């Protein structure tokens, strides 16, 4: 790359000017923050070769290599693509998909977060939009991946049910439930699903396997963001399936493309047209 930089175009592709037109930060595409040890070693080598040897772990689980000269962007891109970590995206596009570990790494996980994040990345990463759109996948209502402050957030949930003939009234599930959603009833238990957040902790602690998962699914949030004008997301689906996840993201992008004002985040578009009207357009 020897011609005059087009900073906006470069930024969209993951090359971010540091203020000095000679140097750029190169942002890598790392869906769900997953890397092999071999990739990490090679990224370190590339950072020494083209930058100043330092790396930055981004808030969205990506990696940035600073102090890369403009004239080296072509070569560093070739090296990064060769190890499966090409430059990512910035600016008005679908950003790096983030996730918590989920199943099987986390004992609280209800879903395979990495797998879902990778599918979302394959379908939607780098799509051009009026402004940025961030997607996060979290394995349970502990919300470690912060779905409520992403433009689209997906949370793994499981609805419990009890086999009363197996219940010994030990009380472990009652003491475990942080929502007060399980109560003793006639020497057994009952669920209050108005209070239950579908975390699945009661299923995991039951010593007799009396509590099991009736169904698993995805709670879906839209319209969250932080930044200068933070907004908590709206929950629009409590138990969706995987197809619903993809459909909603696709429809959010379509509505965003058609109706967003330049620079307007998804949540602020929702505030402008109303959550009811927005839900009609995407469900």
Q: Residue ranges of each PLM-predicted region?
A:
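Small-residue-enriched alpha-helical segments and adjacent helix-cap loops
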Residues: 2, 26-160, 164-168, 172, ...
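Short acidic/polar capping segments at secondary-structure boundaries
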Residues: 138-143, 159, 172-175, 189, ...
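Iron-sulfur cluster-binding cysteine motifs and their immediate structural context
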Residues: 172-191, 197, 201-218
């Amino acid at each position: 790359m020897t011609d005059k930089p087009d900073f906006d175009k470069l930024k969209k592709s993951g090359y971010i000017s540091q203020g000095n037109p000679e140097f750029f930060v190169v942002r890598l595409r790392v869906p769900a923050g997953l890397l092999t040890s071999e990739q990490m070693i090679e990224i370190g080598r590339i950072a020494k070769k083209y930058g100043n040897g330092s790396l930055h772990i981004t808030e969205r689980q990506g990696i940035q290599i600073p102090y890369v000269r403009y004239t080296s962007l072509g070569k560093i891109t070739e090296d990064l693509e060769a190890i499966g970590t090409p430059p990512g995206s910035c600016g008005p596009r679908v950003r790096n998909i983030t996730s918590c570990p989920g199943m099987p790494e986390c004992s609280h996980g209800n879903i395979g977060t990495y797998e879902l994040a990778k599918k979302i990345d394959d379908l939607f990463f780098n799509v051009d939009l009026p402004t940025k759109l961030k997607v996060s996948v979290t394995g349970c209502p502990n919300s470690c991946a912060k779905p409520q402050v992403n433009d689209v957030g997906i949370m793994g949930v499981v609805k419990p049910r009890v086999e009363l003939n197996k219940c010994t009234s030990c009380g472990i599930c009652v003491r475990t439930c942080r929502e007060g959603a399980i109560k003793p009833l006639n020497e057994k238990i009952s669920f209050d699903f108005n209070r239950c957040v579908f975390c699945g902790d009661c299923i995991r602690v039951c010593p007799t396997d009396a509590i099991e998962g009736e169904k698993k699914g995805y709670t879906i949030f839209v319209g969250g963001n932080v930044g200068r004008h933070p907004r908590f997301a709206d929950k629009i689906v409590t138990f969706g399936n995987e197809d619903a996840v993809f459909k909603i993201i696709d429809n959010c992008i379509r509505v965003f493309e058609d109706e967003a004002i330049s620079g307007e985040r998804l949540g602020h578009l929702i505030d402008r047209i109303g959550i009811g009207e927005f839900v009609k357009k995407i469900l």
